[in-house]
């Protein structure tokens, strides 16, 4: 059995920044540091930060007064920001800048009196935060659609004053079909010049297509609640390549590789490389060889830290 590695894979710039914000806050201010929602969707990362003194909560009413709170990479609604400000909580915002870009678009559509359609997955924290940027007090509304069926059933107030945005971690192929359906049903709809799916999601989906084309089975390292990791598994399966989403080596079964010659490995944008190395080590113990990285797209994007943490870390 030969191992092939997707390129790129694993951490993106937004995840790197979010984790570093929590780490630096712990270093500068000491524990406990409260984090609203898992800072990124990866069990290994969350447990490591929890061991260092991070406390993960789902709502601000679980946060005591006079502590530091970090908003996760997925972003939060304006209502959450207002609640934090009203309580005087010290907040560091780890929202991915590419998610913030979508938030700004939604707020602009609201101010302009346009209704907004968000393409995304119900219940995902990024979706909840993005929908919470729309101020419906002026009579407008924001709608959530997941697929073409939702578009066909959608009723809006004014089809002539309508715009769309997308969750950043969706399948590019699925999203393209939904956008086509929106434009067909609502010809006057506006939107971004390209969809809001982030560079890292696009690059990892392109890479897994190449991997699935060259391998007999694909392993996606990522947690079950990671949207972008699930999309990678689905994409490989659509290419008729068996694919498994695993948190780490401990989730693998030896029988998956019976009769397999080429094993492909990729990782979602919130999965650290150490987990990939653990998978490779276990596969080597089962007789696999190599770990050749495919040619891919280089990523050199970085996002800046909050000023206070950036300055304090240099002291």
Swiss-Prot record:
Pathway: Isoprenoid biosynthesis; dimethylallyl diphosphate biosynthesis; dimethylallyl diphosphate from (2E)-4-hydroxy-3-methylbutenyl diphosphate: step 1/1; Isoprenoid biosynthesis; isopentenyl diphosphate biosynthesis via DXP pathway; isopentenyl diphosphate from 1-deoxy-D-xylulose 5-phosphate: step 6/6. The keyword 4Fe-4S applies. Binds 1 [4Fe-4S] cluster per subunit. Isopentenyl diphosphate binds at residues 41, 74, 124, 226-228, 270. Keywords: 4Fe-4S, Iron, Iron-sulfur, Isoprene biosynthesis, Metal-binding, Oxidoreductase. It comes from the Bacteria. One of its GO terms (molecular function) is 4-hydroxy-3-methylbut-2-enyl diphosphate reductase activity. The active site is at residue 126. It is an enzyme of class 1 (oxidoreductase). It catalyses: isopentenyl diphosphate + 2 oxidized [2Fe-2S]-[ferredoxin] + H2O = (2E)-4-hydroxy-3-methylbut-2-enyl diphosphate + 2 reduced [2Fe-2S]-[ferredoxin] + 2 H(+); dimethylallyl diphosphate + 2 oxidized [2Fe-2S]-[ferredoxin] + H2O = (2E)-4-hydroxy-3-methylbut-2-enyl diphosphate + 2 reduced [2Fe-2S]-[ferredoxin] + 2 H(+). The keyword Oxidoreductase applies. (2E)-4-hydroxy-3-methylbut-2-enyl diphosphate binds at residues 41, 74, 124, 168, 226-228, 270. [4Fe-4S] cluster binds at residues 12, 96, 198. Its cofactor is [4Fe-4S] cluster. Its EC number is 1.17.7.4. Gene3D superfamilies: 3.40.50.11270, 4-hydroxy-3-methylbut-2-enyl diphosphate reductase, catalytic domain. Dimethylallyl diphosphate binds at residues 41, 74, 124, 226-228, 270. GO terms for biological process: dimethylallyl diphosphate biosynthetic process; isopentenyl diphosphate biosynthetic process, methylerythritol 4-phosphate pathway; terpenoid biosynthetic process. Belongs to the IspH family. Catalyzes the conversion of 1-hydroxy-2-methyl-2-(E)-butenyl 4-diphosphate (HMBPP) into a mixture of isopentenyl diphosphate (IPP) and dimethylallyl diphosphate (DMAPP). Acts in the terminal step of the DOXP/MEP pathway for isoprenoid precursor biosynthesis. This is 4-hydroxy-3-methylbut-2-enyl diphosphate reductase. It comes from Pseudomonas fluorescens (strain SBW25). The lineage of its organism: Bacteria, Pseudomonadati, Pseudomonadota, Gammaproteobacteria, Pseudomonadales.
């Amino acid at each position: 059995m030969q191992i092939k590695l997707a390129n790129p894979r694993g951490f993106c710039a937004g995840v790197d920044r979010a984790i570093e914000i929590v780490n630096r806050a712990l270093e500068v201010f000491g524990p406990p540091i409260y984090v609203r929602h898992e800072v990124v969707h990866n069990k290994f990362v969350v447990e490591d930060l929890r061991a260092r003194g991070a406390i993960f909560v789902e709502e601000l009413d679980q946060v005591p007064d006079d502590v530091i709170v970090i908003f996760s990479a997925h972003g939060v609604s304006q209502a959450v920001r207002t609640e934090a400000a009203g309580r005087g909580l010290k907040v560091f915002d780890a929202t991915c800048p590419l998610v913030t870009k979508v938030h700004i678009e939604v707020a602009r559509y609201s101010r302009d009196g346009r209704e907004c359609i968000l393409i995304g997955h119900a219940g995902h924290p990024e979706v909840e935060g993005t929908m919470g940027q729309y101020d419906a007090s002026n009579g407008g509304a924001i709608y959530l659609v997941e697929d073409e069926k939702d578009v066909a059933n959608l009723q809006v107030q004014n089809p002539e004053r309508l715009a769309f945005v997308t969750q950043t971690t969706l399948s590019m192929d699925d999203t393209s079909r939904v956008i086509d359906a929106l434009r067909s049903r609502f010809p006057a709809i506006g939107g971004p010049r390209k969809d809001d799916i982030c560079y890292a999601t696009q690059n990892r989906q392109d890479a897994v297509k190449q991997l699935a084309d060259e391998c007999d089975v694909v392993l996606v390292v990522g947690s079950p609640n990671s949207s972008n990791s699930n999309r990678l598994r689905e994409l490989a399966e659509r290419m008729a390549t068996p694919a498994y989403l695993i948190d780490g080596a401990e989730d693998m079964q030896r029988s998956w590789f019976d009769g397999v010659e080429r094993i492909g490995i990729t990782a979602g944008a919130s999965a650290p490389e150490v987990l990939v190395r653990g998978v490779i080590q276990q596969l080597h113990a089962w007789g696999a060889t190599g770990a050749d990285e495919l040619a891919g797209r280089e990523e050199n994007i970085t996002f800046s830290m909050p000023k206070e943490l950036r300055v304090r870390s240099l002291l």
